């Protein structure tokens, strides 16, 4: 298995698909990376030379924010919103949907399992 950005990527898959196993790289960025490096789209990971793996690794380190750094930045952005006390920060703090979805019904994923209320059923 090739190890890129701290992630073991599967060797049997095509390079474009395998790169999407890295947090922060989707299909669009994976296409960009292999075009920059000059690897054919149909090439599989186990067919890559060490030099090509090194080029991919350097390109990702230089041009993209992935894995731990990306997760840290996302959590810091959410923490900043909560510290500001803005509406979005309050919604994050309370564990409710942030982007205007209804909560009277639905929103179970964000709110967690339903809590039983005593005397509610008749």
Curated annotation (Swiss-Prot):
Keyword tags: Ribonucleoprotein, Ribosomal protein, RNA-binding, rRNA-binding, tRNA-binding
Domain of life: Bacteria
InterPro entries xrefs: Rbsml_uS13_C (IPR027437), Ribosomal_uS13 (IPR001892), Ribosomal_uS13-like_H2TH (IPR010979), Ribosomal_uS13_bac-type (IPR019980), Ribosomal_uS13_CS (IPR018269)
Entry annotated with the keyword Cell inner membrane: no
Annotated region described as Disordered, given as residue ranges: 99-122
A GO MF label: structural constituent of ribosome
Gene Ontology CC terms: cytosol; small ribosomal subunit
GO terms, biological process: translation
NCBIfam families membership: uS13_bact (TIGR03631)
Function: Located at the top of the head of the 30S subunit, it contacts several helices of the 16S rRNA. In the 70S ribosome it contacts the 23S rRNA (bridge B1a) and protein L5 of the 50S subunit (bridge B1b), connecting the 2 subunits; these bridges are implicated in subunit movement. Contacts the tRNAs in the A and P-sites.
Record's subunit section: Part of the 30S ribosomal subunit. Forms a loose heterodimer with protein S19. Forms two bridges to the 50S subunit in the 70S ribosome.
Similarity remark: Belongs to the universal ribosomal protein uS13 family.
Protein name (database record): Small ribosomal subunit protein uS13
Name of the coding gene: rpsM
């Amino acid at each position: 298995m090739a190890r890129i950005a701290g992630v073991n990527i599967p060797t049997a898959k095509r390079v474009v698909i395998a790169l999407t196993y890295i947090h922060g790289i989707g299909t669009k960025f994976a296409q960009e990376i292999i075009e920059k490096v000059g690897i054919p789209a149909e090439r599989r990971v186990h067919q890559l030379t060490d030099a090509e793996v090194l080029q991919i690794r350097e390109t990702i380190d230089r041009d993209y924010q992935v894995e731990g750094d990306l997760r840290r930045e996302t959590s810091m952005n959410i923490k900043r919103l909560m510290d500001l006390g803005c509406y979005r920060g309050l919604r994050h703090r309370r564990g409710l949907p942030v982007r205007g979805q209804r909560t009277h019904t639905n929103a179970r994923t964000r709110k967690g399992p339903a809590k039983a209320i005593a005397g509610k059923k008749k």
